[in-house]
């Protein structure tokens, strides 16, 4: 089975065939840098990070671009509130973004173009649209003439006539309505306002509109047509719809062959967003939960579906990550992998699952099956001092788990390093405790148990003198 992707543009799953063999050009709409990123942003960035990793593992070279919107009313409002500048606010939150992404082990994009660094390309694209009759200047602004583009609405499935029926109230509230030829036209360039940053242009000083930024960055860095355009489902309309209208009107070519959209993170049934005030920032979340537990939580739901945020779900993901982490550490410390390879059959099974529209949630089941088998052997080794299965078979299973964990971006040892104890050291202390209790030195046994507890190691005494352990 080959990779298939659900293409929002055609509302169906389609075989993935890149425009150029073994090369994938991929663009993600990035953040507007006026505040710290929240869990919704984490989901978007993490999902496309794993998609990129999977494509690379599948043999593709991936050229991945993600932009920063660093010109926006929200940034200007934040700058006024903090008595700062738009540039200073943007730099502050771009730096915070990179810190958050590093904490979540999200690979950097190949490029991070900014709107303020892309003005030549933006103005060139606006000029091209004007020359082709799709844009017009009006009182220092430049607008896109939506009705001139016959394909408008093909991504979102919306029709202008249907939208017009309920738009009268919104039109009356639009302060730019007198400048527009049609209520649905949108700004490509905004005339300068007093006290706001502005750049020279053929239409007068001003700044670009939001939608034109991405169209220009895609064309300048990846070409007229790319393989995959991704983003959150909240961007389908109007942002991605408007990107298509701009780019395809200017070039006469499709903007992207595949449009992929991730579902929203929800809190009590509503989208997590700053405007609703129901969000938790990534840095707040990571004070409470391991980054790898957050990664597991996000990957447990199919990328197209909504993801419900609860503390209970994150707690369950934490326990799941402990299982995977323990298995990864066990193999690293106890198994000899010289001249051993991963199990090709299991890797093929994983690929067959994930190739069905990036079903990472289904693929996770294979990782847990492997972790369960390795954990069983770990407990046998602790209590009997030897492995039950053939060590070479176990080493192959562990290498398979490690390879799959790498694809999904899981990094072991975080908790091990925090505890400062290796598995072998923990098992040695458990044995010392057993010996102390066997000699009726219960005070020493309690001391060792407390020592392990301080290091985040929980002991579970079971019948028959068996002691199991896990990290908190």
Curated annotation (Swiss-Prot):
Residue sites binding ATP per the record: 274
GO CC term, one of those recorded: cytosol
Cofactor(s) required for function per UniProt: Zn(2+)
Motif 'KMSKS' region location, chain numbering: 271-275
Binding site for Zn(2+): 29, 214, 239, 243
Assigned EC number: 6.1.1.16
Subcellular locations according to the entry: Cytoplasm
InterPro entries in the record: Cys-tRNA-ligase, Cys-tRNA-synt_Ia_DALR, Cys-tRNA/MSH_ligase, CysS_C, Rossmann-like_a/b/a_fold, tRNA-synt_1_cat_dom, tRNAsynth_Ia_anticodon-bd
Gene Ontology molecular function: ATP binding; cysteine-tRNA ligase activity; zinc ion binding
Co-factor note (free text): Binds 1 zinc ion per subunit.
Enzymatic reactions: tRNA(Cys) + L-cysteine + ATP = L-cysteinyl-tRNA(Cys) + AMP + diphosphate
Short motif 'HIGH' region, span: 31-41
UniProtKB keywords: Aminoacyl-tRNA synthetase, ATP-binding, Cytoplasm, Ligase, Metal-binding, Nucleotide-binding, Protein biosynthesis, Zinc
GO biological process: cysteinyl-tRNA aminoacylation
Subunit structure: Monomer.
HAMAP family: Cys_tRNA_synth
UniProt family annotation: Belongs to the class-I aminoacyl-tRNA synthetase family.
Name of the molecule in the record: Cysteine--tRNA ligase
The organism's taxonomic lineage, starting at the top: Bacteria, Bacillati, Cyanobacteriota, Cyanophyceae, Oscillatoriophycideae
Gene responsible for this protein: cysS
């Amino acid at each position: 089975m080959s990779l298939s992707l659900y293409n929002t543009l055609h509302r169906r799953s389609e075989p993935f065939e890149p425009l150029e063999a073994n090369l994938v050009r991929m663009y993600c709409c990035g953040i507007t840098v006026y505040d710290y990123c929240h869990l919704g942003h984490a989901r978007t960035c993490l999902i496309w990070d794993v998609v990129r990793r999977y494509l690379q593992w599948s043999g593709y070279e991936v050229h991945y671009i993600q932009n920063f919107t660093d010109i926006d009313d929200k940034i200007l409002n934040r700058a006024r509130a903090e008595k700062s500048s738009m540039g200073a606010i943007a730099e502050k939150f771009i730096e915070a973004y990179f810190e958050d992404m590093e904490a979540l082990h999200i690979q950097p994009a190949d490029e991070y173009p900014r709107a303020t660094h892309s003005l030549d390309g933006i103005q060139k694209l606006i000029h091209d649209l004007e020359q082709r009759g799709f844009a017009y200047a009006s009182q220092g602004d430049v607008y896109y003439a939506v009705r001139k583009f016959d394909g408008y609405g093909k991504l979102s499935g919306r029709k202008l006539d249907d939208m017009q029926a309920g738009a009268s109230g919104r039109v009356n509230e639009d302060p730019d309505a007198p400048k527009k030829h049609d209520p649905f036209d949108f700004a490509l360039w905004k005339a300068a306002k007093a006290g706001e940053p502005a750049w020279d242009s053929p239409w007068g000083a001003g700044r670009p509109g939001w939608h034109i930024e991405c169209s220009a960055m895609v064309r300048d860095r990846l070409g007229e047509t790319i393989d995959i355009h991704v983003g959150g489902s909240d961007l389908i309309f109007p942002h991605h719809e408007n990107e298509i209208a701009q780019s395809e009107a200017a070039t006469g070519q499709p903007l992207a062959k595949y449009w992929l959209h991730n579902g929203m993170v929800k809190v009590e049934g509503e989208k997590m967003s700053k405007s609703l005030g129901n969000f938790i920032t990534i840095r707040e979340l990571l004070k409470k939960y391991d980054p790898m537990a957050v990664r597991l939580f996000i990957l447990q739901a199919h990328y197209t579906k909504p993801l419900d945020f609860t503390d209970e779900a994150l707690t369950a993901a934490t326990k799941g990550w402990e299982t995977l982490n323990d298995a990864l550490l066990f193999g690293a410390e106890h198994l000899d992998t010289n001249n051993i390879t991963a199990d090709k059959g299991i890797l093929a099974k994983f690929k067959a699952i994930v190739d069905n529209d990036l079903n990472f949630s289904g693929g996770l089941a294979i990782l847990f099956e492997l972790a369960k088998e390795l954990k069983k052997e770990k407990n046998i080794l602790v209590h009997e001092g030897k492995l039950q299965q053939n060590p070479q078979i176990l080493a192959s299973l562990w290498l398979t788990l490690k390879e799959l964990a790498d694809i999904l971006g899981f990094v072991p040892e975080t908790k091990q390093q925090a505890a400062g104890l290796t598995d072998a050291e923990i098992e040695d202390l458990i044995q010392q405790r057993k010996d102390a209790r066997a000699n009726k030195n219960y005070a020493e046994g309690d001391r060792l148990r407390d020592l392990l507890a301080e290091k985040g190691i929980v002991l579970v005494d079971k019948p028959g003198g068996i002691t199991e352990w896990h990290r908190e």
